[in-house]
């Protein structure tokens, strides 16, 4: 069975490797163009391209698929049975969706219809969801509105960051899409179920502005934001006129004026919130490395009563 693969980041690269390891023929891999990255802004291939080249697969990197006759013709010439799409980052128009014999399967990191859109992992943590998961979806022209082929649940742990949930769902998604491809190969079809009309939510793209900590919010809300926005864009506060990223924190039963430092020691930097307080245990000063509070406090002095 011929499988076109379309994806860009690590989340997708894991799925590509799994599909290849399962023995499926992959005549073409689509990924986004190389982009400048890092402090040196060096042109860097996306993880999917790197994985595809290691596997000896053909790679194409169109800037867009909409109104792109050359890309459409390339897809048609492959005569694929199905396309697997994972965090590709480009819109697939209807003519592209219709090209493979069995359409396009998307690996989506939420329990649809909850958290359709760009940042499902982060929004699930931010909202305090007890669980999330992966859906393999038969793509249509809508935003994550297609019928669900399979659903795979994951319990969000109280200390999980977005990075940790991402890595868990990456492995779940890779295994799930392989299982569904194997079913398609053996039965010639997939049983997909329409998404319910109730419970639809949208996972809007993250912004640096919303990641700024508002100490008037409750400690519970802020703690979830810190985990949801870890590693990027990273929750932050202004410290000595510069943004300081907050990487880890826990809720503690203390009270004070919102934004007031209650204590600073090797154990943690405790800051009062609208309700309760947060004990910050890991942070990253502007231009610096991530560090625990013991390392931070050793070179600085933040007195009780100071404002963040």
From Swiss-Prot:
GO terms for molecular function: methionyl-tRNA formyltransferase activity. It comes from Neisseria gonorrhoeae (strain NCCP11945). Its EC number is 2.1.2.9. It comes from the Bacteria. The keyword Cytoplasm does not apply. This is Methionyl-tRNA formyltransferase. It catalyses: L-methionyl-tRNA(fMet) + (6R)-10-formyltetrahydrofolate = N-formyl-L-methionyl-tRNA(fMet) + (6S)-5,6,7,8-tetrahydrofolate + H(+). Keywords: Protein biosynthesis, Transferase. InterPro entries: Fmt, Formyl_trans_C, Formyl_transf_N, Formyl_transf_N_sf, Formyl_transferase-like_C_sf, GART_AS, Met-tRNA-FMT_C, Met-tRNA-FMT_N. PANTHER family: METHIONYL-TRNA FORMYLTRANSFERASE, METHIONYL-TRNA FORMYLTRANSFERASE, MITOCHONDRIAL. Attaches a formyl group to the free amino group of methionyl-tRNA(fMet). The formyl group appears to play a dual role in the initiator identity of N-formylmethionyl-tRNA by promoting its recognition by IF2 and preventing the misappropriation of this tRNA by the elongation apparatus. The gene is fmt. The keyword Secreted does not apply. Belongs to the Fmt family. (6S)-5,6,7,8-tetrahydrofolate binds at residues 110-113. GO terms for cellular component: cytosol.
């Amino acid at each position: 069975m011929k499988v076109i693969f379309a994806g860009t980041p690590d989340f997708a690269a894991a799925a590509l490797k799994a599909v290849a390891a399962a023995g499926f023929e992959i005549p073409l891999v689509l990924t986004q163009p190389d982009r400048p990255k890092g402090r040196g802004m060096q042109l860097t291939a996306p993880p999917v391209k790197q994985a595809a080249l290691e596997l000896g697969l053909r790679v194409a990197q169109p800037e867009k698929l909409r109104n792109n006759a050359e890309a459409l013709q390339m897809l048609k010439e492959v005569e694929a049975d199905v396309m697997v799409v994972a965090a590709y980052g480009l819109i697939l128009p209807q003519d592209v969706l219709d090209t493979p014999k069995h359409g396009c399967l998307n690996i989506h990191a939420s329990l649809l219809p909850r958290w359709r859109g760009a940042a499902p992992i982060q929004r699930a943590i931010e909202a305090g969801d007890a669980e999330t998961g992966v859906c393999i979806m038969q793509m249509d022209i809508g935003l994550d509105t297609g019928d669900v082929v399979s659903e795979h649940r994951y319990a969000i742990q109280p200390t999980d960051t977005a990075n940790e949930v991402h890595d868990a769902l990456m492995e779940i998604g890779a295994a799930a899409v392989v299982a569904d491809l194997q079913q398609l190969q053996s039965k010639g079809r997939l049983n997909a179920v329409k998404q319910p009309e109730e419970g639809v939510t949208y996972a809007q793209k993250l912004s640096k502005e919303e990641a700024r900590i508002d100490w008037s919010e409750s400690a519970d809300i802020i703690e979830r934001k810190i985990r949801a926005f870890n590693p990027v864009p990273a929750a932050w506060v202004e410290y000595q006129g510069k943004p300081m990223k907050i990487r880890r924190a826990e809720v503690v039963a203390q009270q004070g004026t919102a934004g007031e430092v209650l204590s600073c020691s090797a154990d943690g930097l405790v800051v009062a919130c609208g309700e309760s307080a947060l004990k910050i245990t890991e942070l990253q000063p502007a231009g610096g490395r991530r560090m625990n509070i013991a390392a931070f406090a050793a070179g600085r002095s933040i007195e009780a009563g100071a404002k963040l």
